[in-house]
């Protein structure tokens, strides 16, 4: 007599319980939530069975956690039989983070000191302390791994942590801000969300870093290109040379007359606004001024426009003509640097210009 025997030991994972575990809930919390959701009736199970099942799930997740901290090990381990699509789900969800949590630690040093403050972050955001710690440790882990790598930041994060493109880009923001230590905590910047900063980080990484110029560069592309920052000083001529400043103003006013409601306010404040943008550029050779980029944009450009009741449409038209009209100034010789600077600044200001 021949007998074929098939043994299956696929690990059964409940995605809903996994999410609750990630969110920092206790076993008793999860049991209560499952009972409230009618699981006992649905499965015709007793509370003891439900408790036992929840404990088993938690134990499985805790055993998986060590593997999830080095995602490439998940596919090669033999302890759990987990289908590849579920492996991807486990990794992605483990590394997902709450944007309100990320906003609180953005730009801070990923150190023990910051980790000690997570009690306050938890109280402020309503996110469980356990979840805050997991998210913070993930930020720190990704930063430490990619800090030593050469080449494109987003690709390095994807390759080593097997994350989706969107999530890898969000982590690139965390790494970029931790590396450059941009000021994000001042009161005047509190209206800006993590998504606002993530957009700006993407612009800076794409156009101002060493990797933006040469993706075979030895360094990681989170470092702003020093030669570019040094060359920004040449833009000062645009506001220091009275003839150039007057010509620039005349060109922009000629283009915008009758097209924006705040024309008179724009005409009156043109020189101050232009000086603000050019002075921000010329000071970026200093580490402190790089850190203050966002607060400078808010205080020296966004707030004056806001107080004069500019709409987003007014601002977009102004920045477009302000940027492009420079190309017709024959005495101005720094068009390439200007375009590289203003392309990013325009995008960031438009993203940051909201209540």
Curated annotation (Swiss-Prot):
Among the GO molecular function terms of this UniProt record, one is: fibroblast growth factor binding
Biological role stated in the UniProt entry: Mediates with IER2 FGF-signaling in Kupffer's vesicle ciliogenesis and in the establishment of laterality in the embryo. May be involved in mitogenic function of FGF1.
Q: Where does it localize?
A: Nucleus; Endomembrane system
Q: Which gene encodes it?
A: fibpb
Protein name (record)? Acidic fibroblast growth factor intracellular-binding protein B
Summary of subunit composition and partner proteins: Interacts with IER2.
Identify the domain of life. Eukaryota
Inactivation phenotype: Morpholino knockdown of the protein causes severe deficits in laterality. Partial loss of Kupffer's vesicle cilia with the length of the remaining cilia reduced. Double morpholino knockdown of IER2 and FIBPB causes an almost complete loss of Kupffer's vesicle cilia.
* Main subcellular localisation: nucleus
Q: What membrane topology is annotated for this entry?
A: Peripheral membrane protein
Q: A single GO BP annotation from the record?
A: cilium assembly
- One GO location term (cellular component): nucleus
Residue spans crossing the bilayer: none
Enumerate the UniProt keywords alphabetically. Membrane, Nucleus
